[in-house]
Design a protein with these regions (language model features):
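Beta/alpha (TIM)-barrel catalytic core signal, keyed to glycine-rich beta->alpha loops juxtaposed to Asp/Glu
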Residues: 2-15, 144-333
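N-terminal small/glycine-rich loop or linker at the start of catalytic domains
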Residues: 22-40, 98-111, 134, 139
Length: 334
């Protein structure tokens, strides 16, 4: 059976708000689609294709990948490459595609961290897997304490100059090293477009470390990953640990679901319901209420989850009372 030809929705750019990415000409959708865990070889390809098409039809034009996304490693890029060779090929110039290198990808000393050799080789492999001539953003996925920062940053500069990436980004860098990297890149006329880190209602580390303000001062966009704390900030765990959940299987650490955390989640859910939102929708809206956040990367295991997440942008306004109650519910973290 031949698949029907995909034609993107004519209304795709009226579905989401778009935000300026730092001091650049780039606008990103408020919600972007991350392909970390549900786009690899262990999931049906048709499910991944349906999610990508639905996302694009509803204004999500930014797709976020990394060399080792899957599972198995590389297979998220391979599956995305199948789309880029077929249904999404006519829309390449409408898509903003990122990938990364920095975590383990292949054996030996040159398949991990931040050396020039690893970053260059990894991006070449990623481009082949994704059927692309270039990516829009290439990230250094983490700071490498064993490699001079100048080596890692110069590799990013040269990647842009070679035309293999239009922009560069950093992910999961300590604030001090991010500041040094920002300066190095700016001095070579390859400014850092995006800084990516885990940031959500529960995990405020980037804000506490000053990374949101640092990014803004540098003219760098901030993009949040893991906005739902790997499913905690949904209705999934409000009654404990479901038998079919990632926490039950050991993929997530069950020790985080303490009595205090469970009480907080239930309280947050009550706030969300009063707002006419699900807990997940409110968690996404809470991030997007902050003008320092350019975009929020969502993951999804189904089109239905995507549909629910997209509703978050319908109500981004919080009263002072709501914000105070949210902070009170989460005081136990301090």
């Amino acid at each position: 059976m031949i698949d029907p030809v995909y034609t993107a929705s004519e209304n795709r750019y009226s579905q989401l708000p778009y935000r300026r990415c730092g001091r650049s000409g780039i606008l990103l959708p408020a919600l972007s689609l991350g392909l970390w865990h549900n786009f690899g070889s262990r999931k049906p390809f048709n499910d991944a294709k349906a999610m990508a098409h639905y996302a694009f039809d509803h204004g999500i034009c930014h797709f976020d990948l990394a060399n080792n996304y899957g599972p198995e490693y590389g297979t998220a890029e391979e599956n995305f490459g199948r789309l880029m060779a077929t249904s999404l090929r006519p829309y390449r110039d409408e898509l903003f595609i990122s990938t990364k290198a920095g975590w383990d990808m292949w054996p030996g000393p040159y398949g991990n961290w931040g050396s020039r050799k690893y970053l260059m080789a990894s991006l070449d492999q990623s481009l082949k897997r994704m059927n692309l001539d270039y990516v829009d953003v290439f990230y250094s996925h983490r700071w490498d304490p064993g490699t001079p920062l100048e080596e890692t940053m110069q590799a990013l500069v040269d990647i842009v100059r070679q035309g293999k990436a239009l922009y560069v980004g950093l992910s999961r860098y300590p604030a001090e090293k991010a500041a040094e990297a920002f300066h190095y890149l700016a001095d070579r006329d390859v400014p850092c477009l995006l800084y990516q880190d885990r940031f959500n209602l529960i995990d405020r580390q980037p804000e506490q470390a000053g990374l949101l303000d640092l990014s803004r001062q540098n003219g760098t966009g901030f993009i949040s990953v893991s906005p739902l704390q790997q499913g905690l900030l949904t209705n999934r765990y409000l009654q404990g640990i479901p038998a079919d959940s990632r926490m039950a299987s050991g993929a997530l650490n069950a020790s985080v679901l303490t009595d205090a955390m469970l009480a907080a989640l239930r309280g947050l859910d009550a706030v969300a319901r009063r707002r006419g939102q699900s807990l997940a929708e409110m968690a996404l809206a809470w991030l997007l209420r902050d003008e320092r956040v350019t975009s929020v990367i969502i993951g999804a295991s189904s089109v239905a989850q995507l549909q629910d997440n997209l509703k978050a942008t319908e109500n981004l306004a919080f009263s002072e009372e709501e914000l105070q109650e949210i902070e009170r519910l989460l005081e136990f973290r301090n």
